[in-house]
Regions:
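Gram-negative outer-membrane assembly/targeting C-terminal domains
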Residues: 601-604, 609-626
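CBM-like carbohydrate-recognition segments
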Residues: 571-572, 584-585, 593-610
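A short, structured beta-strand-centered segment in the mid-to-C-terminal lobe
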Residues: 532-542
Length: 626
């Protein structure tokens, strides 16, 4: 049996030969790795360095070696260099046209690469001395480039490349994505008629984006007040693509539009149909909750209680089930049924202790918050996932980068039964390595890998990975100076930036606590601090100190954490308006009547995260009954 790190030994022997100028010996070692270790996470690197070794040895097989690497790892970090060196190798063999085509791939697919300028220079030189054929870069390259530009918010550049795609004889290969993306670009610019045209061209293709296009068509129809067309699009989406995550959302939006214009009966009917059809989805479970809400707003508390109890049963395992049981308890209180109220609160508190309404229910009952902890070990036995075994060996040897690479490979290769445990290890690795944003995202992937109803019952290590104590010394110091709860601040930072100090929002908010420059400067003056420049805004200590000052000011102004968080998210002027619209509303009702869904969710999520931080790190994480 080979040692666990045998592939690493062979790989680094090849690297040593390469560094010593013994290129053919290096190529032989990389060949050995590729032949003997078919599950090695180093195969991509071995392919690349094999090609580089052959090129350095001026072996005529070098172009084919680069091609082999690019076929399998065309989007890898070494791809721009591989295309450039492939061009160099082809030039050396007098294959000018093929060399030019290799160079062309770099500025199209890797414009920001340091090899892009060199590739353009070589193309200029070749064009001066040879007659080059037309650019035959595959249409997929321009489509992928357009997607990258689109995701970066550069709509104009994306549009230009998509037009190039459409002019190609092979445009049909990517028509679905092209039509959809052009529709979204028009939607962004509020050119809804043109957006509709693109989406309607995409839907009949019945490919990857057909459900997305139907969803956008639903939204466009609602914007235009065409509820009938919106319902037709949403119904088609739910019928043709019932497994799409957008299926329930489209119907929900139509029902919501009906409720907003006062057609509560029609809205209630559609909410009920949507919820009962998609009870375990986010929007289906929310639709079930909305049925009870509409009934309660008209004073029909008994019917509302029944609707919420039914919603809690149908959407069991979802976050919405917790809110349904909580509001079923409130409705039961309204009709004088203390027994039903107590039972419903208890269900929310014990089954969904990690949710906002589960935590609120525990507070109503005067019981400590408890969250279900999975007692099973998160450890994966040796031999089950070879890449994980290599991670353990490398980690013990303090080979940090290689160890992390093996753990990343293990997260992709692990059997389904072990994937959540491997992802949890990777999450902790990222957080301990100074990347809590990536750590939280990976922990959420781990939670999702478990599936329902497991998301509310996790190993303790996974709970801690979901709620890491990043920047904790800075948070506690700033909280103490401002007289704030450090756990509330941790919850706010987790939701604002996921602890990424360099985060910058589309609106121009900076840093851990997402401060607008003007707000940061005025707060700095009030605290007797120098006004921060852009560098100061992303400095963790400065950002947290100023963010604590902003949050403290809102707490002083409004006196309640829900109102302060609403002001932090949407501004104090809007909070005052909402308070005038609903005078005397208690905290629960106030939150649910906020017209901005983002702010409603923000208040709940920040307070839920704060409660989880207290449970984990202050209260000693008492567990719910197993």
């Amino acid at each position: 049996m080979l040692p666990v790190l045998a592939d690493h030994a062979v790989y680094y022997e090849g690297v040593a030969y390469f560094d010593a100028g013994r290129f053919r010996d290096g190529a032989a070692k990389f060949d050995e790795l590729l032949t003997r270790f078919r599950d090695s996470s180093l195969r991509g690197l071995a392919l690349f360095w094999r090609a580089e070794s052959l090129w350095s040895a001026r072996d005529p097989a070098a172009p084919d070696a680069f091609h082999r690497y690019l076929e399998q790892w065309g989007d890898g970090r070494h791809a721009p260099q591989a295309w450039f060196d492939m061009g160099q190798a082809l030039e050396a063999q007098g294959m000018w046209a093929d060399a030019a085509q290799a160079y062309r791939r770099i500025p199209w697919a890797f414009e920001s690469s340091p090899y892009a300028a060199s590739a353009k220079l070589r193309l200029t030189v070749l064009a001066q001395s040879h007659t080059l054929p037309p650019d035959t870069t595959p249409v997929e390259v321009f489509y992928e480039r357009a997607k990258t530009e689109f995701e970066a918010g550069d709509g104009a550049a994306a549009w230009t490349d998509l037009q190039r795609v459409l002019s190609s004889p092979r445009a049909w290969v990517v028509n679905d994505g092209t039509f959809f993306t052009m529709g979204v670009l028009m939607y962004w610019e509020r050119r809804f008629r043109e957006a509709t045209s693109w989406f309607e061209r995409d839907v009949p293709l019945k490919q990857l984006h057909a459900d997305d296009s139907l969803f956008y068509l639903t939204q466009i129809a609602l914007r235009g007040g065409r509820d009938g067309d919106a319902l037709a699009y949403a119904t088609r989406l739910a019928t043709d693509y019932p497994k799409s995550p957008l299926a329930a959302q489209g119907l929900f939006l139509v029902a919501e539009a009906r409720a907003e214009r006062g057609a509560t009966g029609a809205a209630q009917t559609l909410y009920k149909e949507t919820g009962e059809r998609f009870p375990k989805t986010l929007w289906g479970s929310r639709a079930l909750w909305e049925v009870g809400w509409l009934l309660s707003r008209s004073g029909q508390w008994s019917a509302a209680r029944d609707a919420w109890a039914r919603a809690g049963e149908l959407s069991a395992g979802t976050t919405a089930a917790a809110s349904s049981w909580y509001w079923a308890a409130r409705a039961a209180t309204q009709i004088g049924r203390a027994d039903l109220a107590s039972d419903s609160y208890r269900r929310a508190a014990t089954l969904y202790g990690d949710t906002y309404y589960g935590q609120q229910a525990a507070a109503k009952l005067g019981m400590p918050m408890r969250v279900a902890i999975e007692s099973a070990s998160a450890d994966v036995p040796a031999g089950v996932v070879p890449t994980l075994d290599r991670f353990r060996e490398l980690d013990a040897l303090a080979q940090t980068d290689d160890a992390t690479a093996e753990l990343e490979a293990a997260s992709l290769l692990a059997p389904a039964a072990e994937r959540a445990a491997v992802l949890t290890l990777l999450s902790v690795r990222y957080t301990q390595g100074g990347d809590p944003r990536r750590g939280i995202n990976t922990a959420e992937d781990a939670r999702d890998a478990l599936g329902a109803p497991a998301p509310h019952r996790l190993p303790l290590a996974m709970w801690q990975a979901l709620y890491p104590r990043a920047q904790w010394p800075v948070i506690t110091q700033a909280a103490a100076r401002a007289g704030l709860d450090p756990y509330l601040m941790a919850g706010l930072i987790r939701e604002e930036s996921r602890f990424d100090p360099s985060a910058v929002s589309a609106a121009g908010a900076y840093g851990l606590m997402q401060l607008m420059p003007g707000t940061a400067q005025s707060t700095a003056r009030s605290l007797g601090m120098a006004a921060p420049d852009q560098r100061g805004l992303v400095d963790p200590a400065t950002n947290i100190t100023l963010g604590a000052g902003v949050l403290k000011a809102e707490l002083v102004r409004f006196g309640r954490s829900d109102l302060a968080l609403a002001a932090y998210n949407a501004g104090p002027n809007l909070v005052r308006r909402w308070m005038r619209d609903h005078p005397g509303a208690d905290a629960d009702t106030f939150v649910e009547t906020i017209p901005y869904g983002e702010t409603r969710g923000y208040i709940k999520t920040v307070q839920q995260s704060a409660a989880m931080y207290r449970w984990l790190y202050q209260d000693g994480h008492p567990a719910a009954a197993q």
